[in-house]
Every structure is written in structure tokens, then in C-alpha cells.
Amino acid sequence: MKKLPVCDISYIQVRFLPIYLHQIIEKVNTKNQIIMKPEHLTVDTFKEKVFNYEASKDWKFEGDKPAIIDFYADWCGPCKIVAPILEELQEEYGDKLNIYKVDTEDQRELGAVFGIQSIPSLLFIPQEGQPQMAMGALPKETFKQAISEVLNVN
């Protein structure tokens, strides 16, 4: 059995640690507060956290707080305008709401389920009631208005 130097083992541990932490938090500010960023969803995490469309055709939100889902693509110019706004909103509202992102190029099934034909498309999901879809690069004030009026989050 070949012995590995301790530094090689720690390299392996450190190498994979940021990948895991990236899924939970993105950065820490100067006051050592955790700053959350929008979470990227796959088909499986979507079914778990938002709506299991295979189990039921009737809308049943699986989340524990209101959410916004950004259906986007990396090559989309307007999507690149919306991305930093959503990051600011996630930081501003913290754990009062969840902001998720769905890459329509990687998660084509989710785009098809919601009939996404233009991006960005944004799904506003209140804790109770039906979700509402908006399309296009919305300004921050419009997001804040929808968060207040549709999601009932202040």
C-alpha cells in the first residue's frame, strides 16, 4: 500500500470543500454574516423544493416560504441584467423568501413543463395560492412590488 504525504490528503479535502460550501453559501461579508445567493435547481431539487408535477397535476407548493424562480440561460443578455438584481434581493430579503434559478439549457424538462418560450421568465410563488409568471428583464422596483403584492413579503 502506497503512503500518501499528509499534504496530498489535505489538498484533496480542501479541493472538494469549496464545491460543497458553494451550494450552501456564496460569500461572507466583512461583518462575518452569511450572504445567501439564489440557489440553482435541477429537476429533482425542483420537485422536492417547489412542485412535484409528476405526483400531481394540481399545483401544490412544496416550499416553506414564498419563492421566485428565474428561468434563464447563460447566453441571454437580459438574463445577465436580472441575475445581480436577484442576488441583491436575496441578500435584502434574506430568509423571508427563496430565490431559485433554473438554467433552461441544462434543465430542459423544467422549461417544457412551464412552457417557457422566452427568457428570462420569472415565476412568483406565494406561500398560499397560485403562482404568477412574468417575462423579461424586470427592474428592481418591479421585483420589490411583486414581492410585496404577490408574495406578501415586506
Language-model-derived ranges and their functions:
Residues H40, F71, A83-Q90, G94-E109:
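Thiol-based oxidoreductase modules, predominantly thioredoxin-like and allied folds used
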Residues V28-D44:
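N-proximal helix/coil linker or "cap" segments that precede and/or mark the start of modular domains
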Residues L17, L21-Q23, Q33:
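Short hydrophobic targeting helices and cationic amphipathic motifs
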Residues L41-A67:
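A short beta-strand-turn-helix
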